[in-house]
Amino acid sequence: MRVKKGVKARRRRNRILKLAKGYRGRRKNCYKRANEAVERALDYASRDRMQRKRDFRRLWIVRINAAARTVGLSYSKLIAGLAKAKIGLDRKVLSDMAIADPSGFAAVANIAKAA
């Protein structure tokens, strides 16, 4: 007996169209256009997950640098001092500390300055 792939094909197409929900124009209801748009969107999503990590690191460094300069240090001198003093705070924590607890950040920066 001949086996047709109607159910599987419909399910596969519906999965793509479901992912394309909210798109404008033919990209939301024309399978071929929707498939192209979804494929591109998934590519961008993969790329931007890596990009987000870089963007946040850059943001943290800018914040730390600004806070370090208020206590008379540059970013590089602060990081070098923290390494010498064996203080294992990462950039995310330092950035949060600079915003939420400036006096605590100043204390850590002074330890780094002394090292």
Swiss-Prot record:
GO terms (BP aspect): ribosomal large subunit assembly; translation
Pfam short name (any one): Ribosomal_L20
Key words, A-Z: Ribonucleoprotein, Ribosomal protein, RNA-binding, rRNA-binding
Record-linked PROSITE patterns: RIBOSOMAL_L20
GO cellular component labels: ribonucleoprotein complex; ribosome
Sample GO molecular function, one term: structural constituent of ribosome
Highest rank taxon of the organism: Bacteria
Keyword RNA-binding: yes
SUPFAM superfamilies: Ribosomal protein L20
Official protein name in the record: Large ribosomal subunit protein bL20
Species of provenance: Myxococcus xanthus (strain DK1622)
